[in-house]
Curated annotation (Swiss-Prot):
UniProt-recorded name of the protein: tRNA-specific 2-thiouridylase MnmA
InterPro entries hit by this protein: MnmA-like, MnmA-like_C, MnmA-like_central, MnmA-like_central_sf, Rossmann-like_a/b/a_fold
Site (Interaction with tRNA): H128, Q346
Active site, renumbered: C103, C200
Intrachain S-S bonds: C103-C200
Record gene name: mnmA
GO BP annotations listed: tRNA wobble position uridine thiolation
Domain of life: Bacteria
Length: 375
């Protein structure tokens, strides 16, 4: 059996079952394991209970059970400056941001990784469902994990080679039910703990209410694409392209079909709405993305290649042709078939079969070379 005892691995422990089982597996494999809990947000809830404190209690219990040392580190300042300010700026600009991606690139796999390396760690391990593979040239590739249903490569898509080569994902060949079973058999207190959902700093709170505490909302008209006023919106930032819920609009003489958000006019502060799921205004055949990052390093020259892509987290891959512009690190992505509700601010993520190639941020979507008025 290989001797891993000289290899130090810092495990990011959230108090959840995934990172707990990650720590357990590494310990069983003989690594020198250290658990670290990160506090990113002062999340005292409406009843005055700080969920981070409860989570850290779980980390302590699990670490004691497994027999590993543990620490806690505060990254509230970094999180506030690099993730939350970006989140607010994007909403202000009418876009729909993805703070989880930013949290990974700027906090979990940057400040936290640096902290782990300062603790003399050889690797940082996380309980994400993702997989890495090192090729014969020593280059690390990002792969889809065994559990396709939990696949988190979408949120990791903007990490670099420098970051992923120091990272381990111990759950890469396990499914979530298998992870829960391992936790139960090992008697971990959080074996049945509920999965976290939604944006971490909002938790179970009402999204509109949360956002209104940070950004002043300016209400305006809801209009049809030909300019007819049909209602009032509470602030453009509360709506996302393709959204149906919460518009409060009923049937019309012409149609009983539900209403959907099909655009935003920031200048006029108007929300553009239309009846019917399949509005042609929602369908794009191309997008532009910036800040493109490839796990194996960005190509130095302009390139064109076929791939599959996701434009949002829970979506089946679609076939695309990518034209990458090396100087600006931007890409034009042409879809094999028109795609619905491609939303500026969300991430574009590219795949080649089982491999996740990388991604960027969606800036604009087009149909027949005409830019859709989505922000
Ligand atoms: N507060 C935290 N401190 C340290 N590491 C964290 C923290 N939050 C998340 N992580 C790390 O990031 C991974 C993915 O985070 P995510 O929020 O997606 O959790 P999850 O899939 O619900 O996992 P878990 O069951 O471990 O909470 C976690 O498994 C853990 O390794």
């Amino acid at each position: 059996m290989v001797d891993n005892s000289k290899i130090r691995v810092v495990v990011g422990m959230s108090g959840g079952v995934d990172s707990s089982v990650s720590a357990l597996l590494l310990k069983q494999q003989g690594y020198d394991v250290v658990g670290v809990f990160m506090k990113n947000w002062d999340d005292t809830n409406d009843d005055g209970v700080c969920t981070a404190t409860e989570d850290y209690e779980d980390v302590k219990k699990v670490a004691d059970k497994i027999g590993i040392p543990y620490y806690s580190i505060n990254f509230e300042k970094e999180y506030w400056e690099r993730v939350f300010q970006y989140f607010l700026k994007e909403y202000k600009a009418g876009r729909t941001p993805n703070p989880d991606i930013m949290c990974n690139t700027e906090v979990k796999f940057k400040s936290f990784l640096e902290y782990a390396l300062d603790l003399d760690a050889d690797y940082l391990a996380m309980g994400h469902y993702a997989k890495t593979m090192v090729d014969e040239n020593g280059v690390t590739h990002m792969m889809r994990p065994k559990d396709g249903n939990k696949d988190q490569t979408y949120f990791l898509s903007q990490l670099t080679q420098e970051q992923i080569k120091r990272v381990m994902f111990p759950l890469q060949d396990l499914t979530k039910p298998e992870v829960r079973r391992i936790a139960e058999e090992a008697g971990l207190v959080n074996a049945k703990k509920k999965d976290s959902t939604g944006i971490c700093f909002i938790g179970e709170r009402n999204f509109k209410h949360f956002l209104s505490e940070f950004l002043p909302a300016q209400g305006g008209d809801m209009v049809t694409p030909d300019g007819k006023v049909v209602g009032h919106h509470a602030g453009l930032m509360y709506y996302t392209i393709g959204q149906r819920q919460g518009l409060g609009l009923g049937s019309t003489k012409e149609s009983t079909a539900p209403w959907f958000v099909v655009g935003k006019d920031l200048e006029k502060n108007q929300l553009i709405v239309e009846q019917g799921y399949d509005s042609p205004r929602l369908y794009a055949d191309r997008l532009q993305a910036s800040g493109m990052t490839f796990f194996t390093g960005n190509p130095e020259e302009d390139t064109e290649f076929k791939a599959t892509a996701k434009f949002r987290y829970r979506q089946c891959d679609v076939g695309v042709t990518v034209k990458y512009h090396a100087a600006s690190k931007t890409a034009d992505v042409y879809f094999d078939e028109p795609a619905r509700a491609v939303t500026p601010g969300q991430a574009l993520v590219l795949y080649n079969g089982e491999e996740c190639l990388g991604g960027g941020n969606i800036d604009a979507a087009f149909k027949d070379d005409k830019k859709l008025q989505l922000v």
